[in-house]
Amino acid sequence: MSHENERLVIIRHAPYSSNALREGLDVALVAAAFGQTVSLLFLGQGVLALLKEQKTGAPGQKATLPTIDMLEMYDIDQLLVPQSALDALHLQVDQLVEGATVVADAGLPELLHRHSQVMNF
């Protein structure tokens, strides 16, 4: 059952590969500022946005790690990563920012169903 005003933002793009990551984070921040419950699910290359040791992008591109770090101030504390995404990128959870939570792939359908709004970036 989905809950009203619960939004799941799915991030699929790596930092600096396009504007999709930044746009997804902006949507999450705006929704949270208006009192919606927001969870972030990082899939595929999107998991790279959660790396502690993130490199900077090309000149003129804003770093995404400061935005990730301030999500908690907006009560966005669900930073979810499927185990398969970590495995595919040969990453361990300790390489990710504090607060990232590994979820079982089997639980993803229920996670999607639980949110009234799902947005992909």
Could you tell me what each predicted segment is?
Residues 8-22, 54-55, 59:
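Short, glycine-rich nucleotide/cofactor-binding loops
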Residues 115:
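An anion/phosphate-binding loop that grips the pyrophosphate of nucleotide cofactors and donors
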Residues 41-50:
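Short connector loops at secondary-structure junctions
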Residues 21-40:
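Histidine-anchored nucleotide/phosphate-binding helix
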Residues 6, 37-39, 78:
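Residues at the starts of beta-strands that form the adenosine-phosphate
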Residues 99-106:
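Short acidic-hydrophobic, aromatic-tinged amphipathic segments that line or gate anion-handling sites
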Residues 57-87:
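A glycine-rich helix N-cap at a beta->alpha junction
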Residues 111-112:
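Structural alpha-helical scaffold elements that stabilize or flank donor/cofactor-binding regions
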